[in-house]
């Protein structure tokens, strides 16, 4: 297990949440907010992808253990901490998640016309949660990330989905929640 002096994996995981904060601070009329929200989300997700590529370039596929391990205290009184790292299985999924998010933002550039800021917030939150799911080495942290992915997905499907979006969102949420409760 290789630990790093700079918490690159934690920064990669939570960088999209910094974008969420910027999105929440955007003011102006609806057109200005929509345009700026798209741009901020694209830039933040693009930078997250570039950071994941840097992580991939520095990843040693010949090393069998976890790399870029970040440890920290979370609930010290209960002895619960968090631990994040990558191995040969999780690394491609992190890069894939970081790659697909800007593509999804670009794909929705013209199709999402209402509540654009909220849509971009949901996507950046989803990116944080996906990367966190693949990077978590602690069972509690993994479970929290894994379950929390349901929230932005429910919102995205329920608000910007197709004709039966509300039905689909509830069905997705309930089936996924029921399947993961056994974990």
Features from the language model and the residues they span:
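Short hydrophobic/aromatic segments of transmembrane alpha-helices and their interfaces
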Residues: 1-4, 14-15, 72-77, 122-126, ...
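Transmembrane helix-loop-helix hairpins at membrane boundaries of multipass inner-membrane proteins
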Residues: 1-8, 23-106, 110-121
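Structural signature of hydrophobic alpha-helical transmembrane segments
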Residues: 5-15, 86-97, 139-152
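Hydrophobic membrane-targeting signal helices
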Residues: 13-14, 22, 55, 135, ...
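Hydrophobic, membrane-inserted alpha-helices
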Residues: 19, 101-102, 125-130
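Glycine-centered flexibility sites
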Residues: 19-20, 85-88, 158-161, 179
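Hydrophobic transmembrane alpha-helices of multi-pass small-molecule transporters
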Residues: 20, 49-52, 105, 131, ...
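Alpha-helical multi-pass transmembrane bundles of energy-transducing inner-membrane proteins
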Residues: 29-37, 121-125, 129-183
């Amino acid at each position: 297990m290789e630990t790093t002096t700079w918490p690159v994996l934690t920064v990669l995981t939570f960088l999209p949440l910094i974008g969420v904060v910027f999105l929440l601070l955007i003011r102006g009329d609806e057109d200005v907010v929509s345009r700026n929200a798209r741009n901020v989300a694209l830039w933040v997700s693009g930078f997250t992808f570039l950071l994941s590529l840097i992580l991939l370039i520095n990843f040693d596929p010949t090393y069998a253990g976890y790399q870029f391990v970040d440890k920290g205290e979370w609930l010290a009184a209960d002895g619960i901490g968090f631990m994040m790292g990558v191995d040969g299985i999780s690394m491609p999924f992190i890069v894939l998640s970081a790659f697909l998010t800007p593509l999804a933002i670009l794909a929705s550039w013209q199709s999402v016309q209402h509540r654009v800021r909220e849509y971009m917030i949901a996507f950046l939150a989803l990116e944080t949660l996906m990367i966190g799911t693949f990077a978590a080495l602690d069972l509690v942290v993994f479970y929290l990330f894994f379950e929390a992915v349901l929230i932005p997905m429910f919102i995205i499907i329920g608000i910007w989905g197709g004709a039966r979006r509300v039905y689909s969102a509830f069905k997705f949420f309930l089936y996924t929640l029921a399947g993961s409760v056994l974990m």
